[in-house]
Amino acid sequence: MIDRRKVRNAFHRGAADYDAYAAVQKRVMERILSLLFAEGVEPARILDVGAGTGALALRLADRYPSAAITCVDLAHGMARQARDNLGRTMERLVAVADAEHLPLRDGVFDLVVSTSTFQWLTTLDRAFAEARRVLADDGLFAFALFGDGTFKELKASYRAALHSVPRGGRDRTHRFFTRDEVRAALARAGFRSVEVFDEDEVEYHPDVPAFLRSVKRIGAGNASPVAGRGLSGRRVMETMMRTYAERFGGADGIPATYTVVYGVGKR
């Protein structure tokens, strides 16, 4: 079970640094935009769920200048950053809200879009049902989330460390949704013309501590393992970092894989 309060607080604290460290998230945003353009949609009303600092909303505003864009994010710090970035003309369209409980009327939007957000939910059902609820007939739902395979190097190294350190404890890494789970959740929510696929994005860091710091800087620290208490917990983390560097390190540093699941469906 994911503690949503911890997620909210982490992204609240990471809001100011997010854009400087979210390189993969920016590439994902551009990919989802290319999917929208390929769909040929011309929405009049757009909802951005988990809008973060407003980067996607700005790009959507450039592409659809006459569209009314509403942004929601669970974290107060992110919503505040989005208001600053979007400027006064869009300030009234930014709200603090939960993807699982949208404070919005039924059938309002032609497009609901989200990137790098839904992986922080325990299940996808409520958020997908809410997205469908606020969509108008024939409205489009397009999203990207980090799926199973994300941080596979970190997970493999951490599990190896748990097995090698006596009383190392349990696996504390975040569980990401599989592509099949995403597709099934869309079907349960009642979406039609569903398309789901995944792509890998690989980011390189100088070393493992630098990677872990970057993840924490963008508020996503809950995706990385948390050391248990005491000496054994410290040994697990030390062993994990050494194993990561030995198994996966190279001339470019250490890789961190993000498996991005993209989904599109119509109401």
From Swiss-Prot:
UniProt EC number: 2.1.1.197
Catalytic EC class: transferase
Provide the catalytic activity annotation. malonyl-[ACP] + S-adenosyl-L-methionine = malonyl-[ACP] methyl ester + S-adenosyl-L-homocysteine
Similarity section: Belongs to the methyltransferase superfamily.
Q: What exactly does this protein do?
A: Converts the free carboxyl group of a malonyl-thioester to its methyl ester by transfer of a methyl group from S-adenosyl-L-methionine (SAM). It allows to synthesize pimeloyl-ACP via the fatty acid synthetic pathway.
Pathway in which this enzyme or protein is active: Cofactor biosynthesis; biotin biosynthesis
- Annotated protein name in UniProt: Malonyl-[acyl-carrier protein] O-methyltransferase
Q: Which Gene3D superfamilies match?
A: Vaccinia Virus protein VP39
Keyword vocabulary terms for this entry: Biotin biosynthesis, Methyltransferase, S-adenosyl-L-methionine, Transferase
UniProt-listed Pfam families: Methyltransf_11
Biological processes, Gene Ontology terms: biotin biosynthetic process; methylation
Which taxonomic lineage is given here?
Bacteria, Pseudomonadati, Thermodesulfobacteriota, Desulfuromonadia, Geobacterales
Which GO terms fall under molecular function for this chain's record? carboxyl-O-methyltransferase activity; malonyl-CoA methyltransferase activity; S-adenosylmethionine-dependent methyltransferase activity
Q: Which organism is it from?
A: Geobacter sulfurreducens (strain ATCC 51573 / DSM 12127 / PCA)
Q: Which domain of life is it from?
A: Bacteria
